[in-house]
């Protein structure tokens, strides 16, 4: 998992960063890339039997189905980010901060590889509430807030 300086500068606090990292950890833990390649390969193999002029239709259908798999993986990664962070000192809904910031990009959800940001915030918040996770950082009085701000300044 790589964290780029632009992400650190973009986010407001360590819980937001922990939420994004937790989301990416879930992709690796749940083997989303491997699962998606297997699912798409199976569908493409099945659709290739159609043959003839229908080959283009089969390719387009395969791509649209792939988008749905990707959205499901994104939702699962959001859920596991909350589960991973719930027992920690970070807010379990830290990833929601990122989605609040980016807002809607205007792409219709059915053509996107990622679910709508507003839906993601709602799902993350629901998951946090269902698991009775903390609503606040457990280090707000500590040095980590200052350290995160100092890190952002150092990256300028």
Stretch-by-stretch model annotation:
Residues 1-156:
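A Zn2+-metalloprotease active-site environment signal
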